[in-house]
Amino acid sequence: MFGTRIHGRGGQGVVTAAELLSVAAFDSGRHAQAFPSFGSERTGAPVVAYCRVSENPIRTREPIVAPDALVVCDASLLGLPEVLAGLTDADLDRTIRYTA
């Protein structure tokens, strides 16, 4: 199973990105699920969404604590401890950065 956690702010398309990943995986013949984790936040508030992809049926629905891939859509969130939670130093060495 491959787990992706996506962090961003409300209005940046974080939930949509997770859903698109899961649809692409499903269209490729894999099992997939995507779900957000947020309360009654407003535009600009931190949001996290998850996407799991597997060759087998996915029976869990819990948040992804140790993701295989981490996407951060807003660099200002990197100061929040929950954003990098579950990553090891080796994971951080494989960081790909893009600045527009």
Where are these regions (language model features)?
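Active-site cofactor/cluster-binding pocket
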Residues: M1-A100
